[in-house]
Design a protein with these regions (language model features):
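N-terminal glycine/serine-rich phosphate-binding loop of ATP-dependent small-molecule kinases
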Residues: 1-97, 125
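Generic secondary-structure signature for well-ordered alpha-helical cores
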Residues: 60, 64, 116, 145-149
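Glycine-rich phosphate-binding loop and adjoining helix at the ATP-binding site
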Residues: 86-141, 145-146
Length: 149
């Protein structure tokens, strides 16, 4: 028999589930973690600790005390908090904490600047939707202005 593995890396925890081929839950696990809030309305994750180590820990929890092996996995589904912004170096190592999706509002000023510069009509033409705190572009501009290194 084959098994399906699902992992969801969320804002405050990681959920994992193993299903058999009939989609019956064989095992599930949860690991709680916290976001970092360095300032009001700023929300971050330490990607190395929260995402990568958390992912490995949830996999370990799912495969502990089971009568099957990882080789029996026939499908994997993974989801995570997004859109998040995580700058990395040339070796894909995080340069700082990840800025979380729309709950982090530090780029509000950049949203206004871009919208003013392009105009709402042109912005909708290009982007097909207005910029929000979910948008990555304003976060890139925020980095450029505030953490250029």
């Amino acid at each position: 028999m084959g098994y399906l593995l699902g992992v969801d890396i969320g804002t405050q925890g990681i959920k994992g589930v193993l299903l058999d081929e009939t989609l019956k839950i064989v095992k599930k696990a949860y690991i709680e973690h916290n976001y970092i809030q360095p300032k009001a309305n700023w929300f971050e994750h330490d990607a190395e600790e929260t995402w990568w180590k958390g992912f490995k820990a949830i996999i370990q929890k799912l495969f502990t005390h089971n009568s099957f092996s990882p080789q029996e996995i026939i499908g994997i589904g993974c989801s995570g908090v997004s859109p998040c912004m995580l700058p990395v170096d040339s070796r894909d190592k995080p340069l700082r904490n990840a800025i979380l999706y729309g709950i982090d509002t530090r780029a509000q000023k950049e949203i206004s600047e871009i919208t003013q510069r392009l105009g709402e009509k042109k912005l909708l033409e290009i982007n097909k939707q207005p910029l929000t705190t979910q948008s990555v572009g304003p976060k890139i501009l925020w980095y450029k202005k505030n953490e250029p290194e």
